[in-house]
Amino acid sequence: MFKLFTARQHDKIWDFDGGIHPPEMKLQSSTVPMRIAPLPDQLIIPLQQHLGPEGELRVRAGEQVLKGQPLTVGRGRTVPVHAPTSGMITAIAPHTTAHPSGLAELCVHITPDGEDRWREQQPWADYRQRDKMALLDRIHQAGIAGLGGAGFPTASKLQGGLNGIITLIINAAECEPYITADDRLMQEHADEVITGIHILRHLLQPQQVLIGIEDNKPEAIAALQRALRGQDDIHLRVVPTKYPSGGAKQLTKILTGKEVPFGKHSSSIGVLMQNVGTVVAIKRAVIDDEPLIERVVTLTGDALSSPGNFWARIGTPVLYLLKLAGFKPQNPPMVIMGGPLMGFTLPSLDVPIVKISNCILAPAETEMGLSEPEQSCIRCGLCVDACPAGLLPQQLYWFSRGEEHEKARNHNLFDCIECGACAYVCPSNIPLVQYYRQEKAEIRALDQESARAAEAKARFEAKQARLAREKLARELRHKQAAVKLTDADQQTVDAAVSRLTRQSDGSESVINIPAGQMPDNSAVIAAREARKAQARARQAEKQQARSTEETTDVVDPRQAAVAAAIARVKAKKAVQAQHVTTDVAEAGSEAMAEDPRKAAVAAAIARVKAKKAAQAQHVTTDVAEAGSEAMAEDPRKVAVAAAIARVKAKKAAQAINPD
């Protein structure tokens, strides 16, 4: 009884809240065998085809490349891209890519040479002989990203699940209308699907492996059952058709009954999920050494005369594929990449196929119906009932329109899987998913700006802290240099301290200097006075020389005689002043020899006399100059000036020698 209950638990299927049942529209492409698209005249390979940064280029324009040769460097979360065929790189330039914005991205343009020559390949016949890190590196260097639409780097996802994965789920639901790429892949390549699952089991070592597939794919179910015959370690679970049962969180709930918490991934509850197309790409990369250079693309819609699924090389222009399926342009033209609910209208038909391009929908004018204008929300609540993520689409709509970013974030906007179920049931024709996508982009932009501001603030604070540390270090070095003394400096300081100590010890005693023991400065004083007298004599000689030069220009003999007399008087006074200074110095020295007090008095008298002599000399010079000016005017005035000069000179001499 317990075993029967356990078996029933293993086969149990749960359900998720919400969801819709739109028309499937799959038969027009699922019943047609897959075709291989020929090589176009030009391949355009975008450098970024995954969720993450683009890789660094390894090639240049004009270079010949081989099929499978890497065009960019794969490092970290950067997934490399490869040449889909052999040929020449004609350009590396921006080109419009498969994105709703229609912005141009950097692409490698390759002109095929028609030979389709492979690079050297190294197949691994037995992958079990390789360690896990080698397998992960092989998958990463093959450029594999999630082919289900998200484009997450597969190797990074697998590496994060090496420990703690309980359940491995293979997503074969393919729930969106019109898309049948995985359906035809399972019908025609079921063995490769199972081999890829075994590789993942070897890597992850999960406790159970589940394949989830909707019940509207009977041919694919039968093909998988044939490939699984005799294998009990992989369980095929057929689930009811309901959109969006192919979502990661929704399929996890259906197969395990576990709900992924808000803001987290399925790996947080021990579940890892891979798409069927990704599993086949892993098998070809590990065993056959084939990088991801092609994928299955569904071409469908009433605007095509021969819809179906094609093996298309990465970089093939969309218009080229549409022509292979018998494209009949509509008015106005409309081509959608992806399904009718989660896809977007292409801005141009020259955009290339990328790794996440699973469907090209070309509807007829009557197929999509008339576009009705957007109306006001009537708060009917149908969007809430249809939301498979358990969100409040109506509130998120108001927050998005009102730019209330924090409220939108707090209401788990980023848990929205953009399935379009809310917009599908909205009676007001409000494009809710477009509002959510725009709001997510604005929040991401604000987060990036905040992160840049935080980084700038951190750099500024780090710089200020560094400058403060350097300042403290400089001050400390200066203090250490000021405190640190050499041996010689220390000896000098010690000697000065000892002298001060000795002086302080005798500072209270009275100093009595007997007569005759005073410092004898008489010689120094006499020498100084002699130098002053010599300087005055030299000045007098210079003035005499100038006077002589001036007298040579005088034409009148009387003026010459007066000038000569004045010069003689100046010379005589200078000599007398020198003799007086010398006598005073000698007298002072004799007096100092007798008594220090007398020496001081004599020195003071000598200074006074020297000062008077200098004043007399200046007076004589002024008189002489005045006389020379007067001589130039009148001889009588010259005679009077000479007499006055003689009187003043006599008085000055008497003042110097009163005795």
UniProtKB/Swiss-Prot annotation:
GO MF annotation list: 4 iron, 4 sulfur cluster binding; electron transfer activity; metal ion binding
One cellular component term from this protein's GO annotations in UniProt: plasma membrane
EC number annotated for this UniProt entry: 7.-.-.-
GO biological process, one term: electron transport chain
Membrane topology: Peripheral membrane protein
Keyword check for Metal-binding: yes
Names of the cofactor(s): [4Fe-4S] cluster
InterPro entries in the record: 4Fe4S_Fe-S-bd, 4Fe4S_Fe_S_CS, Ion_transpt_RnfC/RsxC, Nuo51_FMN-bd, Nuo51_FMN-bd_sf, RnfC_N, Soluble_ligand-bd
Residues binding [4Fe-4S] cluster 1: C377, C380, C383, C426
Pfam families reported in the protein's UniProt record: Complex1_51K (PF01512), Fer4_7 (PF12838), RnfC_N (PF13375), SLBB (PF10531)
Stretches assigned to the 4Fe-4S ferredoxin-type domain: 366-397, 407-436
Subcellular location field: Cell inner membrane
Co-factor binding comment: Binds 2 [4Fe-4S] clusters per subunit.
Binding site for [4Fe-4S] cluster 2: C387, C416, C419, C422
Keyword annotations: 4Fe-4S, Cell inner membrane, Cell membrane, Electron transport, Iron, Iron-sulfur, Membrane, Metal-binding, Repeat, Translocase, Transport
Binding partners and assembly: The complex is composed of six subunits: RnfA, RnfB, RnfC, RnfD, RnfE and RnfG.
Biological role: Part of a membrane-bound complex that couples electron transfer with translocation of ions across the membrane.
Family listed: Belongs to the 4Fe4S bacterial-type ferredoxin family. RnfC subfamily.
Name this protein carries in UniProt: Ion-translocating oxidoreductase complex subunit C
